[in-house]
Amino acid sequence: LKRNIIDECVDSIDQINSKEFVKNIDLIVLAVPPKQTQGIFNRIDEVWNTDTTLTDTSSVKNHIKLDNVSNVILSHPIAGSDKSGISAANENLFINKKNILCDPFNSDKIHFEKVEKFWKDALQMKTNLMTVNEHDLVFAMTSHLPHLVSYALIDSIRLSNHDVGDNAGGGLKEFLRLSGSNPEMWSDIFVLNR
């Protein structure tokens, strides 16, 4: 609020869990570590099947299980950074990047269109539809495994007690960048996407 980045905030996720609170809210985007996504969806069950659309930003989808919902579309913006927090905010982060949408709950078309419009129009992203299984397999290979290898490599170098800094090439620098990503988020991803 102080930086004029958001118009309104809530102190607790429990504030959201009422039809009265969300009656004037079009879209709620959950941006939490992957292991927290299911729990947050469960805690806001009063918002299920309302006119408010719910989406997430989790890099893993197979663990999200919801029954009888018509307003939840899963999203995965493919636009990240090894930096996190408000100090790492980048207004151009999403422009021309891809966002994967999954609709495992066969939600009402209006909710799918609302989520797609949000990512395309508000954030200038390109969207692609995948099944949950396809999403998790593709990103296990193209994102999750490379991050896992980077953590393992950097840890191996650290444990070797060798100073390789003067001999490090561009490839190692990319692994260093990847291994600098948020460890809580990546730990969740590795555990959830097996």
Go through each PLM region and give its residues.
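NAD(P)-binding Rossmann-fold cofactor-contacting core
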Residues: 1-15
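Short, well-ordered alpha-helix to beta-strand connector turns
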Residues: 6, 25, 51, 96-97
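Hydrophobic/aromatic beta-strand patches that form the interior of the parallel beta-sheet core
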Residues: 10, 55, 73-75, 100, ...
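Rossmann-like NAD(P)-binding element
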Residues: 14-48, 52-53
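Glycine-rich, N-terminal phosphate-binding loop of Rossmann-like dinucleotide-binding domains
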Residues: 32-33, 58, 103
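Rossmann-like NAD(P)(H) cofactor-binding subdomain of soluble oxidoreductases
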Residues: 38-88
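Internal alpha-helical scaffold of NAD(P)-dependent oxidoreductase catalytic cores
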Residues: 91-180
